[in-house]
Amino acid sequence: MRIFLVGMMGSGKSTIGKRISEVLDLQFIDMDEEIERREGRSVRRIFEEDGEEYFRLKEKELLKELVERDNVVVATGGGVVVDPENRELLKKEKTLFLYAPPEVLMERVTTENRPLLSEGKERIREIWEKRKQFYAEFRRIDTSRLNEWETTALVVLEALDEKEISTIEKPHLVKIILGGFKRVRNEELVFTTERVEKIYGRYLPENRLLFPDGEEVKTLEHVSRAYYELIRMDFPRGKTIAGVGGGALTDFTGFVASTFKRGVGLSFYPTTLLAQVDASVGGKNAIDFAGVKNVVGTFRMPDYVIIDPTVTLSMDEGRFEEGVVEAFKMTILSGRGVELFDEPEKIEKRNLRVLSEMVKISVEEKARIVMEDPYDMGLRHALNLGHTLGHVYEMLEGVPHGIAVAWGIEKETMYLYRKGIVPKETMRWIVEKVKQIVPIPVPSVDVEKARNLILNDKKILKGSRVRLPYVKEIGKIEFLEVDPLELLEVVD
């Protein structure tokens, strides 16, 4: 694979190129820096000593070399597109134009080692006017409203050809496809969020409804609005609503689709890692009511789910780690892919090979569990690993769900080790990996408040016991009924 990035100075070619190299295991080459290395002097000195014409000659020679190389992502110089021969070479490659308006570029750039700006940043407008017709010959990505990870995700998605990773037929169809998100443009109606539209709007069909991000969408008010819109459209039972977003949005979409006209078609395109490895698979749909999370819901399997790990690249830090926690949970439940967590730097840099394998293992394990227990009566309780104490941390500390579950996994495992149930080696390995993913120390909590939360947990069985899932050995899940108040010994 070869990816070339073109654009004005300050458009982010080098920054985004470096991220892409880590995501796709490609070599990163900055053409200006490579010319400097070969010449043994800065671009500014080359301009001063030999002139711009000499520099452009060296630039053209280098470009001809690079289009013959494999597995590279290249940040071109801003003026490479002026030469028509260069443009013809670049048109034969996966070339993306990173756009930002001149006023944004002026905020981003410094004049250091930029000979064309020796007279000041205002020259950017003049340079843009001369070059914009050439940039327009390439696929454009507007970076002005996107952060670095959002831009990276969009460039990678544009550059990738479809590659199928896995197909799961039961309990419902799930396809894991790199580049598969682009199929969403063929959907009849999409429910999505403003953030998803901001990043991926170019792929969404015109027929779409926007809803809030996160748990805010899971209310009767938004359900009513969706019903009114569907009635206004005269939406028939034979058509499909596609939920495009995170877990809250897919929960909401599933609830609406399963109740409107007693059920219309339903598909998901999950855009967060947590939704890909958990919420979009298994047929649980719900909204919140009277302050209680997921208290009104349905069991309704989607007709199909398209999972593209590429779109998780755009996630905010923190939210991304929440998804990694869920994937870690599924990995230790299945016993597959534990070696992925021996590459923490690859996970941190969102390497797509590692992410794709994590998603594949997680979805396959979730599908296996749901097949055996579709209505959450037994084995599916294994998915509650870390959730008993995780619920306590989520409520008392106000942290995101994924972080709370990570702390819950750590503390519940330590409790079971102290009881002589989980072996020391297993406990140490799990705790080490959890701390690696979420390096935030587990806080002490008010024991009395924790006690009240535990006693009111919906997972409490008759006789005030809780069925606690645990990993005795990696890949071996077991259950133990315990007095939930005993768990308090590890939370203070």
UniProtKB/Swiss-Prot annotation:
Family matches, as InterPro entries: Dehydroquinate_synthase, DHQ_synth_AroB, DHQS/DOIS_N, DHQS_C, P-loop_NTPase, Shikimate/glucono_kinase, Shikimate_kinase/TSH1, Shikimate_kinase_CS
Its EC number(s): 2.7.1.71, 4.2.3.4
Coiled-coil features, chain-numbered ranges: none
Region (3-dehydroquinate synthase): 162-492
Molecular-function annotations in GO: 3-dehydroquinate synthase activity; ATP binding; magnesium ion binding; shikimate kinase activity
Pathways involved: Metabolic intermediate biosynthesis; chorismate biosynthesis; chorismate from D-erythrose 4-phosphate and phosphoenolpyruvate: step 2/7; Metabolic intermediate biosynthesis; chorismate biosynthesis; chorismate from D-erythrose 4-phosphate and phosphoenolpyruvate: step 5/7
Superkingdom to which the source organism belongs: Bacteria
Keyword tags: Amino-acid biosynthesis, Aromatic amino acid biosynthesis, ATP-binding, Cytoplasm, Kinase, Lyase, Magnesium, Metal-binding, Multifunctional enzyme, NAD, Nucleotide-binding, Transferase
Region annotation (Shikimate kinase) ranges: 1-161
Primary role: Catalyzes the specific phosphorylation of the 3-hydroxyl group of shikimic acid using ATP as a cosubstrate.
Name this polypeptide is given: Bifunctional shikimate kinase/3-dehydroquinate synthase
Organism: Thermotoga maritima (strain ATCC 43589 / DSM 3109 / JCM 10099 / NBRC 100826 / MSB8)
Lineage of the organism: Bacteria, Thermotogati, Thermotogota, Thermotogae, Thermotogales
